[in-house]
Amino acid sequence: MFRAYQLLAAALLIAASTAFAGESGVFSHQTVQAGDITLHYEFADAQSLAKQREFTAVITDGIRYYQQLFAGYPLDLTGKPYTDITVRVRHGKHLSGEADPKLLLLTWSDGMMFGIHNWQTLLLHEIFHLWSAESFRYQNGREHWFNEGFAEFYAFKAATQLGYISKRDALAIAAQPIGFYHSATGLGKLSLRDAGKDNQSKLDNYFLLYHGGWVAAMLLDHDIRSRTANKHSLDTVMRWLYQHYPRNIKLYNNADIIAAIKAGSGLDYQVFFTRYIEGTDTMPVAQHFDLGKALWDFEFNPEQQHQHVYLYHTLGILTDRQL
C-alpha cells in the first residue's frame, strides 16, 4: 500500500474510509460497466466526479494489463476471482492511495510526488496491489521491499506500455529510484528486509525500502532476461506466486520469493538475496546496465540501441512481442 512520506498524507490515508462515510453532501455514487469490469464509484467532491472518465480509463487499462501479467483476475479473501471494485476518490493536497480486496482508495491532485509519481502512476501502483499484497500476501513486513518495490517497478512499466508516460521519460524516471536508494541514510547499515519490519521502520526508511525494492526488481528482471536470452523475466515469477500462494491458503516469505524465481526462470538467486536483500551490501547497478548510455543511445544513436535491449524490455520500452 503506497503511502506518502508526509505525515499529513499518511493521516489522510488512514482516515479515508471514515471521511468518505462521514461527510454529508459530498457523496456521488456512480456505477460504470467496462466490459467485464464493474466500478462502483464513491466521489467525495465535484472535481473528482468530473474526472470519472479519466479514472475509469486508467483503472480499466491497469486491470487488463495486470490480468494479462498474472493470467487471472484479482482474488478475494476466499480465493475467488472478481471484477467488481469499489473506487473511493477525493481531491486533496497530497497524493495517496490504498488497496484492499475489491476496493481502491485514491486522493489525487495535479501535482507530482517526489518528482516521479502523478495520480495515474499512483493508481497503477494501487491496482497492482489488488494482486500482489491482496491476492497473494507477505507473511510480515520484512517482505515489504518486495511488496512495495515491485509495485513501483510494475506501475511504471505498465504506465510506459499503456502510454501514460513516454519511453524517454521511462529511462529518466528509472534513474530516480537508483539515486534515492544510493543516498538513503540506511544504506549499508540496514537490510532491505529490516527496513520494513514494522510500520515505523517502513516510514523512517521509505526511500531505502521502496526504491531499494524497485532497484532490486530492475536488476533481477534485467539479469533474468540477460541470462535466458529474454525467454524469462520477473513476469513469470509474479505469475507463479499468484498461482501458488493464494492468501487464503498460505503466505509467502523471502525463501518463497527465491523459490518462485527459480521455478519461473530456472535460476538460483540465493547469493543475491543473501548479500543485497538479507544483508547490507549495496546492489551493483553499474555491473548490470548503464542507464545513462541507454538514454543517450535512445535519443541519439538508434544503431546502438541493440546494446540495451534487455533494459528496454525491463522498463517496458520494448514489449516481449518486439524481440
Task: Walk through the language-model features, giving the residues of each.
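Bacterial N-terminal signal peptides
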Residues: 9-16
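Soluble non-cytosolic domains of exported or imported proteins
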Residues: 49-61, 114-118, 122, 141, ...
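Juxtacatalytic substrate-recognition/specificity segment
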Residues: 27-139, 143
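Acidic/His/Gly-enriched intrinsically disordered linker/tail segments
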Residues: 142-214, 227, 245-248
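Structural helix-adjacent loops and short alpha-helical linkers that scaffold large soluble proteins
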Residues: 162-171, 224-233, 262-272
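Bacterial N-terminal signal peptides that target proteins for export
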Residues: 1-8
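Boundary at the C-terminal end of the N-terminal hydrophobic targeting segment
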Residues: 19-21
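Beta/coil-rich, acidic/histidine-enriched accessory regions frequently appended to metallopeptidases
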Residues: 247-323
